[in-house]
Amino acid sequence: MKSLIQEKWNEILEFLKIEYNVTEVSYKTWLLPLKVYDVKDNVIKLSVDDTKIGANSLDFIKNKYSQFLKTAIAEVINQDFEIEFVLLSQTKAEEKVQTQAPNKIKNESLSYLNPRYTFDTFVVGANNNLAHAASLAVAESPAEIYNPLFIYGGVGLGKTHLMHSIAHYILEQNPNSKVLYVTSEKFTNELIESIRNADTTPTEFREKYRNIDVLLIDDIQFIIGKERTQEEFFHTFNTLHESKKQIIISSDKPPKDILTLEERLRSRFEWGLTVDIQSPDYETRMAILKKKEELDCLTIDDEVMKYIASNIKSNIRELEGALTKIVALSRLKKKEVDVILAEEALKDLISPDNKKTVTLDLIIEVVSEHFTTSTSEIYSDNRSRNIAYPRQIAMYLCRKLTSLSLTDIGKMMGNRDHSTVLHGCNKVEKDIKKDPSFQNTIDVLIKKINPTP
């Protein structure tokens, strides 16, 4: 009987999906990971893969889908069964051997992957469609196209979600793949530890990072200024690339804007494809909230969703955090979620007019942060390229986004002559015409200075 039910399992799930109008996201999130573990005495034991769903979701699956599953099984098998659920991590030792990762690298990688960060739960919009398409292409054909894949964008916009999605997809398609996801901070810390224990660990460190199929390294900008880390990563990159292994990198800015990055690393980062993620527009923000509502099994009024999407515009993390805060306040006060409650929950996040006033100081703050300089250096007489170029970009943006005259901009930026400001603005305009991709840097900065609805 077990073999029959296993054979018919996909048919059972499809029947349930259609009969009870289960959405595609819920189907893939809660039902597809269920597997027939055992059948005995008219009881079917279904294993819940807690590496994908999470052990805390077991009660939800029981309450939501037990009766649906019993009905679907009876319809397809023509026999009544009771349903029990077991966590995959608690099943027999031999079952564990079959389902767990076959090597240390995979086990370690899985421990750092968020089970909810998959392509199925990633909301695609105009702000991220190229990054999503490139990530999926790399996941489907590692090291065949776009190597390396460089994903950049601001905090909380979905870079890490895409990287985890790539790792999950590759491991699902080929469980024997050696996939390693790390942050640049972890890479640096492990390098430091290997140097401290020079008798044993340098070889282990290199073996770990160079004997793999896919390397995903998050927030690469944090290796800036760390010469030894850049040196080690340079050789790691070369070894993997020459061996036709896939490399995926994320950062808060494109390679050409990481001014203190070694040129040899910058050029290698640009060998493949560079894609960006921008702040989501209103429609995408609504879709993100709807997806979170579904995944968290919530029921939220559309007016509340519209209120959040209209007022929280900066990034996905804050958007989802706002919804979580509203739901938490609702449970604490035992009140229904409505716009009045939402206003109370988000009063510290939303001012009556949350649109930023664009000032010269704000522009310089954003530009200096983007190019990893300080505001004092922008105002200073330092003429090195690492400082002068961001200064010229700040001048250009001040002219574009404020009503300040060239003379006023010059005075406020260290008593510079208006001709100096004009020269800086003209240089930036020429660079935009010469390198169209530079326009994207300007667009990113403008978004940071004053995000549009």
Curated annotation (Swiss-Prot):
Under Gene Ontology molecular function, one entry of this record is: lipid binding
Query: Positions of the region Domain II?
Result: 79-111
Q: Which InterPro entries match?
A: AAA+_ATPase, Chromosome_initiator_DnaA, Chromosome_initiator_DnaA-like, Chromosome_initiator_DnaA_CS, DnaA_C, DnaA_dom, DnaA_N_dom, DnaA_N_sf
The name on file for this protein is Chromosomal replication initiator protein DnaA
The terms describing its cellular component in GO are: cytoplasm; plasma membrane
Its localization reads: Cytoplasm
The segments labelled Domain I, interacts with DnaA modulators in the record are 1-79
- Subunit text: Oligomerizes as a right-handed, spiral filament on DNA at oriC.
- Share the domain note from the entry: Domain I is involved in oligomerization and binding regulators, domain II is flexibile and of varying length in different bacteria, domain III forms the AAA+ region, while domain IV binds dsDNA.
| Ranges that cross the membrane | none
Which residue intervals make up region (Domain III, AAA+ region)? 112-330
What NCBIfam families does the database record attribute to this sequence? DnaA (TIGR00362)
| Domain IV, binds dsDNA as annotated region, ranges | 331-453
Q: What does this protein do?
A: Plays an essential role in the initiation and regulation of chromosomal replication. ATP-DnaA binds to the origin of replication (oriC) to initiate formation of the DNA replication initiation complex once per cell cycle. Binds the DnaA box (a 9 base pair repeat at the origin) and separates the double-stranded (ds)DNA. Forms a right-handed helical filament on oriC DNA; dsDNA binds to the exterior of the filament while single-stranded (ss)DNA is stabiized in the filament's interior.
Entry's Gene Ontology BP terms:
DNA replication initiation; regulation of DNA replication
Q: Which gene name does the record give?
A: dnaA
Sorted alphabetically, the keyword list is: ATP-binding, Cytoplasm, DNA replication, DNA-binding, Lipid-binding, Nucleotide-binding
Q: Which family does it belong to?
A: Belongs to the DnaA family.
Q: What main location does UniProt list?
A: cytoplasm
Query: Where ATP is bound, by residue?
Result: 156, 158-160
